[in-house]
């Protein structure tokens, strides 16, 4: 039985509407699920014209009204914006507010059992904050409105999976957030996530923070004072956590099948290796030829 996926349209001034339309041109999507866009019908109609898509926009008031047929894009039309209300490619509070409200609505639908899962298009954090919604990203919005205290972000591309101790904070603050309790929390979330994905005995690689894992404290003591104690506590709890492993080698080992998931200490430490693997830029065409990978909220 096909499940209903609630798909946010993303920031209406950004690429979200176009991505949505292009993705739903593939008939295989409809073979595997029932996609329901949450957004503004007028914006999605413009995106259809812009990309030259042959499809019909079908506004609905409830997921039960969706047709879920290829060639028809069902959208829960919130009626927040029209094309003339904002400029494409420009940061604005109006677009940021709409993008936030799409996410809020899809969470509501999921919690009410009206959609089986959610998928989010990009939002602009600056625009969202201009609108008065002070969150640093999707992960934090989901955690807040589901009442989830323990959570993290996971990136995945094929068998490479990465979770993060911190994400959308400055590098200076990220270093301050490397604490035993938080590292242990993320290791535990990673272990449960792997088990939920069918990995019976997850092997968790934990990255260090400093060059060469601090070289015995010469280049920083986070590995000694925070990360290693967290790993030891996890192992005592029966979790197969290994490390700390130098950040410049742990991802090669993960790609080689040594770990099922990697715990990164901060945003770019985890994002860069995954995007090096999943993103391919064509020098001749001066365009991306592949952009693969997904961001999954855990907790």
Which stretches of residues belong to each language-model region?
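Flexible loop/hinge segments that line or gate small-molecule binding clefts
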Residues: 136-162, 167-170
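Short, intrinsically disordered, charge-balanced linker/junction segments flanking boundaries
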Residues: 296-299
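Contiguous, glycine/small-aliphatic-enriched amphipathic segments in soluble metabolic enzymes
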Residues: 1-138, 183-205, 209-265, 269-294
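Active-site glycine-rich loop that binds ribose-phosphate moieties when present
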Residues: 140-149, 171-195
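Helix-enriched interaction subdomains in cytosolic or periplasmic regions
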Residues: 121, 128-134, 157, 161, ...
